[in-house]
Regions:
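Predominantly soluble domains enriched in secretory-pathway, periplasmic, or organellar proteins
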Residues: 100-102, 118
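Hydrophobic residues in well-ordered beta-strands that form the structural core
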Residues: 112, 173, 194-195, 201
Length: 214
């Protein structure tokens, strides 16, 4: 089943509760929460206190994507705030296995993310321990970027690795997702699609979300 996880990075922060209710009513499956520290990526967004507050307005699955250095130091905060899944970058921690296990020990699902130029071998050894791999299809840090086409064969290679290992792992794709690129990544094996500007910039939010699954 294909899941759509709108990124609230593209929402109107002045009306964040309303923006989340809007995507929930329109058929979103998850809420994708982009956490940036201004160091691992060249931008700052929000942290666990915002997650804790928006947790009060929806029961949707919270997928927290930590684009931060040394993510270990923030895991407790996001667990306490009500995150359902925490995704860390393989490039951002020296002890990926330990980090993933700590996330799971806190009662959350664990995901690992890769930047566009990072090879799949960085996650190969951790696959049996994760619930999801996030492949970035733009360089992280800002919304509204163009889709990097080489992500499509990368998704297919990852799906083969997962299937060959007999594992059941979601593949999430984030960056430049719209009604056209969504078809490409789904056919390659992606199961969770992150879309920010395509969903929040649409005149008809429900139709935009539906088009990502069509």
């Amino acid at each position: 089943m294909i899941k759509v996880a709108p990124s609230i990075l593209s929402a109107d922060f002045a009306y964040l509760a309303d923006e989340i209710k809007k995507i929930e009513t329109a058929g979103a499956d998850w809420v994708h929460i982009d956490v940036m520290d201004g160091a691992f990526v060249p931008n700052l967004t929000f942290g666990a206190p915002v997650v804790k507050n928006i947790r009060k307005v929806t029961d949707l699955f919270f997928d927290c994507h930590l684009m931060v250095n040394n993510p270990e130091q923030y895991i407790d905060d996001f667990a306490d705030a009500g995150a359902d899944m925490v995704v860390v970058h393989a490039e951002a921690t020296k002890h990926l296995h330990r980090c993933v296990q700590y996330i799971k020990n806190k009662g959350m699902q664990a995901g690992v993310a890769l930047n566009p130029a990072s090879p799949l071998c960085l996650v190969e050894e951790i696959l049996p321990d994760v619930d999801m791999v996030l492949l970035m299809s733009v360089n992280p840090g800002f919304g509204g970027q163009s889709f990097i086409e080489t992500t499509v064969p990368k998704i297919a290679r990852l799906r083969k690795m997962i299937n060959d290992a007999g594992l059941n792992i979601e593949i999430q794709v984030d960056g430049g997702i719209n009604d056209k690129t969504s078809k490409q990544v789904r056919e390659a094996g992606a199961t969770v699609l992150v879309a920010g500007s395509y969903v929040y910039g649409a005149a008809d939010t429900k139709a935009a979300i539906a088009s990502l699954k069509a």
